[in-house]
Design a protein with these regions (language model features):
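Acidic, glycine/proline-rich low-complexity segments that act as flexible tails and inter-domain linkers
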Residues: 1-35, 47-48, 55-64, 70, ...
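Short, structured motif recognition centered on aromatic/hydrophobic residues
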Residues: 37-45, 74-75
Length: 98
């Protein structure tokens, strides 16, 4: 059981909302592609310093056709808006995905 599954044991409603609202509804809306949603989500997580959530979303971004080079460019661009530490901390999460 991974860490997210362990947390959802204590908050089954949060799991239900994540699955049924966030991923089955919000992520499926047609005006933004899954690729664009991945970019937006990664930028938000990085800017807010939510690096614990990055591994899941980096894997999802790769499934949504983002390359490691594009992810590197995302975090490079973000450094100027969210700060160097946020960008470097986020960038360091790319490698463990291999």
């Amino acid at each position: 059981m991974n860490n997210t599954e362990q947390l959802f044991r204590y908050a089954p409603k949060l799991k239900q909302l994540s699955e049924q609202v966030l991923f089955a509804d919000v992520w499926q809306r047609p005006l933004l592609s899954p690729r664009e949603r991945s970019l937006i989500t990664l930028a938000a997580l990085a800017a807010l310093g939510r690096t614990e959530q990055l591994p899941f979303h980096l894997t999802l971004a790769e499934k949504n056709s983002l390359t490691k080079e594009e992810l590197g460019e995302l975090f490079t661009h973000l450094a100027f808006y969210a700060g160097w530490p946020a960008a470097v901390s986020s960038l360091s999460r790319i490698e463990p995905q291999e």
